[in-house]
A protein has these predicted regions:
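Conserved nucleic-acid-binding Ia/Ib motif block in the N-terminal RecA-like helicase ATPase lobe
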Residues: 51, 55-106, 262-264
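Conserved helix/coil segment N-terminal to the catalytic DExD/H
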Residues: 87-121, 132-137
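Post-DEXD/H (motif II) to motif III coupling segment of the RecA-like Helicase ATP-binding lobe
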Residues: 120-121, 128-192, 359
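Conserved RecA-like P-loop NTPase helicase motor core
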Residues: 261, 267-362
């Protein structure tokens, strides 16, 4: 490939592992996936790759929050104003165009293919979503010669990981969390197991009913609230994660009654309000954020030091994404902790043991 008219801003210096990952992608012919944990600088590596090839670039994301983040980072890292194609805007005039999968999926197949022919390179952020039907239908119509996938968690529990590589190429670089922790690029959190003592009224319930009963249990919720209060008393900022919107709303209200600055960060919160919450949280004006899966990706809070996992997850890649929120280094940050709730049923303790193996692999204490 020719040298690109894009270049890194003078204050951006790639770390050795970032440079090595981009070089590996180039040597693989400009196709492949870079696997890197939260805090490793996936966006920096993606944009560094764009400086190696002189072509128009399409960045594909699956949320408006991520689209906005890429827009900001393009200006900071390569000094280019990216244009946005999605979320109500349809501007494809930029040297770099950031588009949402959902917007492209609404185009007719032939129309999308003709539109995408203007791009010589395609970057997919959170690339582990590519095997999903909606994203696959978009990817087959993107003819870009150069392709780069970025993800912390390429392995899918549904066994469709091969589809990711079919669309984007092999894994060309895999950056190890333990190595990053040794270099001080991420901070491995301490794991605190919090026994709730909770057990369901009857054994053998289906998963959805089990989670409903768990998240509406008064004693269990009191345990969560009390531990969050103690963390805030220690000067910590807490992210409480739950799979249920109602649970997040309940916990935010319960904590607000103790005069804490507690907010719910859920799907129904507007884009403008989310940006406002993140800005206030980064200024330490918010004590506790209670969030659903919308926080799994695209939640940018470098100063966050405490994550509470309040609903059990069988998807280890999702757990890894979630604890990654606390692993970014920050000068004013306390030792990060992940508070993992453990309940009484044997099945849930079995899932907790799988999480323990993940934590060990990631170098958590």
């Amino acid at each position: 490939p020719d040298a690109s008219s894009l270049s890194l801003q003078s204050d951006i210096k790639l770390r050795d592992y970032q440079e090595s990952a981009v070089d590996s992608w180039l040597k693989a012919g400009g196709e492949g996936v870079i696997v890197a944990p939260c805090g490793a600088g996936k966006t920096v590596m993606g944009l560094a790759a764009t400086t190696k090839i002189d072509t128009k670039v399409l960045v594909l994301v699956h949320t408006r929050d991520l689209a906005a983040q890429w827009g900001e980072r393009c200006q900071q890292i390569v000094g280019v104003d990216a244009t946005l194609y999605g979320g109500g805007k349809k501007d494809d005039t930029g040297r770099i165009v950031v588009a949402t999968f959902q917007t492209l999926e609404r185009m007719r197949w032939a129309e999308r293919y003709q539109w995408a022919k203007q791009f010589g390179m395609c970057i997919v952020d959170e690339a582990h979503h590519v095997p999903a039907a909606t994203f696959c239908s978009v990817m087959v119509t993107i003819p870009a010669r150069y392709r780069l996938g970025l993800t912390a968690t390429p392995d899918r529990p549904d066994g469709l990981t091969d589809l990711l590589h079919w669309h984007l190429g092999p894994t060309v670089a895999s950056i190890d969390t333990k190595m990053l922790a040794l270099e001080g690029q991420v901070v491995a959190p301490r794991i605190e197991w919090l026994n709730t003592g909770w057990k369901p009224k009857k054994e053998g319930q289906e998963w959805v009913k089990l989670i409903t009963e768990m998240t509406t249990d008064d004693d269990r919720n009191a345990t969560i609230v009390n531990r969050a209060l103690a963390a805030v008393d220690e000067g910590r900022q807490v992210l409480i994660l739950s799979d249920r919107v109602d649970h997040c709303l309940f916990l935010a209200n319960a904590l607000a009654e103790y005069s804490l600055q507690a907010v719910a960060f859920v799907g129904s919160v507007s884009k403008k309000k989310r940006a406002e919450i993140l800005a206030r949280a980064n200024d330490r004006e918010i004590d506790v954020i209670c969030a659903t899966t919308v926080a799994d990706e695209g939640l940018d809070l470098p100063g966050l030091d405490t994550v509470m996992l309040t609903t059990p997850s069988k998807a280890l890649n999702r757990v890894q994404q979630r604890i990654g929120r606390a692993m970014r280094p920050h000068p004013e940050k306390k030792e990060p902790i992940v508070i993992d709730l453990v309940d009484e049923p044997r099945s849930l303790r079995g899932i907790a043991r799988k999480r323990l193996r993940l934590y060990t692999r990631l170098g958590c204490r």
